[in-house]
């Protein structure tokens, strides 16, 4: 199995790295990285992206440009984690194979830093370009966005792996629920939602968002969730993997405003969830109401419409309160930032509180204290 994986990666590398140099137009093209302190080049990138109708994404950790022989920037592309983002070529040079060269460079960069399973979000009108470069469609929002990966059967293999958990299912189970949870950190509000879903259903599939962009690391979030729900015996735990991502890291460069970004994320995320639900026979999903969150409010509204269209019930559960205030992870983070660890004691399960007063918890506390107020609040 390992040799097959190496072979497929090697072939993808050959296809994307060797082919570009067969274009004679490439002789005078240079691909170079651009750093955040290069103000002039970054301003030129913004200009190019604007010309091509693309916003610069807020989440980028690497950017490159294509220079012509006169050192003009005629193309650009970026990465974030295991994704490729913000690809654009000047309209004057489109059709010359520059996209191929930029993508090849980005894939080489990703391989060099150990990322072999790659993803890209692209416009509906240009996804065929990436199909020709070895990327495969996962899901799409018609006339808007296509989500792609460089593994031919990557998502199908993920679904097959998930479906193995059905072997542990009660054969007579009729009510099979799901919750997708970040838990940054795990609170009594999260526990209330899980306990309700567990009580009202035969089986509960609990997906823990595994991308490590939250201030509380994934391994800690997973541990606290599992410890805090150990008394519930009908839960099947899943790492979300690379297919379910948070709104915080969803690419924003396709949409004109924040509302459009949230709607795109919700629609794409729910397309993926529906496929997961079918693989696991899930027929109901539980989510927590979050009246103060613009993101969750829009997401829940779309979900309440889309899931029933696919035969899945959607329950939006009123949030648990303490002294008239909603218990939320952002409120817990706020108290930690203020140094009020004792103040979270009645807002989190015992296992979460014990973590934050432990030596291991001190590192996370220090990171939370360094956050600005915008990063504390969940929008």
Question: What residue spans do the PLM features occupy?
Answer:
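Short loop/turn microsegments at loop-to-beta-strand junctions
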Residues: 60-62
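Classical Sec-dependent N-terminal signal peptides that target proteins to the secretory pathway
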Residues: 2-24
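A generic structural motif
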Residues: 66-70, 201-204
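Conserved acetyl-CoA pyrophosphate-binding loop and the N-cap/start of the following alpha-helix
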Residues: 93, 97-105, 189
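Conserved GNAT acetyl-CoA-binding A-motif
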Residues: 110-123
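Short amphipathic alpha-helix that is part of the acyltransferase structural core
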Residues: 21-57, 67-68, 72
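Nucleotidyltransferase catalytic core that binds NTPs
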Residues: 122, 126-135, 140-379
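Conserved beta-strand in the GNAT
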Residues: 65, 71-88
């Amino acid at each position: 199995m390992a040799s097959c994986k190496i072979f497929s990666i090697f072939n993808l590398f050959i296809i994307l790295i060797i082919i570009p140099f067969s274009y004679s137009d490439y002789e005078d093209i240079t691909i170079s990285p651009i750093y955040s302190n290069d103000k002039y080049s970054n301003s030129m990138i913004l200009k190019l992206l604007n010309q091509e109708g693309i916003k610069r994404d807020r989440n980028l950790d690497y950017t490159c440009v294509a220079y012509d022989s006169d050192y003009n920037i005629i193309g650009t592309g970026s990465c974030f984690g295991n994704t490729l983002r913000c690809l654009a070529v000047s309209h004057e040079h489109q059709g010359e194979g520059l996209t191929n060269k930029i993508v090849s460079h980005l894939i080489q960069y990703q391989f060099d830093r150990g990322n072999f399973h790659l993803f890209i979000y692209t416009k509906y009108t240009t996804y065929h370009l990436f199909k020709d470069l070895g990327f495969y469609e996962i899901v799409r929002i018609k006339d808007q966005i296509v989500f792609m990966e460089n593994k031919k059967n990557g998502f199908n293999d993920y679904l097959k792996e998930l479906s193995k958990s059905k072997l542990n299912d009660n054969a007579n189970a009729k009510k099979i629920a799901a919750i997708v949870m970040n838990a940054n950190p795990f609170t009594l509000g999260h526990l209330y939602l899980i306990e309700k879903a567990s009580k009202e259903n035969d089986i509960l599939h609990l997906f823990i968002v595994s991308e490590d962009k939250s201030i509380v690391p994934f391994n800690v979030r997973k541990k606290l969730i599992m410890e805090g729900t150990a008394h519930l015996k009908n839960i099947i735990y899943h790492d979300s993997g690379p297919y379910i991502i948070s709104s915080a890291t969803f690419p924003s460069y396709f949409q004109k405003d924040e509302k459009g970004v949230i709607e795109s994320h919700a629609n794409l995320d729910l397309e993926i969830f529906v496929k997961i639900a079918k693989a696991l026979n899930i027929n109901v999903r539980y989510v927590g109401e979050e009246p103060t969150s613009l993101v969750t409010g829009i997401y829940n509204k779309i979900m309440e419409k889309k899931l029933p269209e696919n035969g899945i019930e959607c329950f939006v559960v009123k949030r648990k309160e303490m002294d008239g205030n909603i218990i939320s992870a952002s409120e817990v983070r706020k108290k930690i930032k203020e140094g009020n660890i004792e103040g979270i004691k009645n807002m989190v399960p015992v296992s979460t509180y014990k973590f934050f007063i432990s030596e291991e918890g001190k590192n996370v506390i220090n990171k939370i204290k360094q956050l600005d107020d915008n990063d504390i609040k969940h929008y």
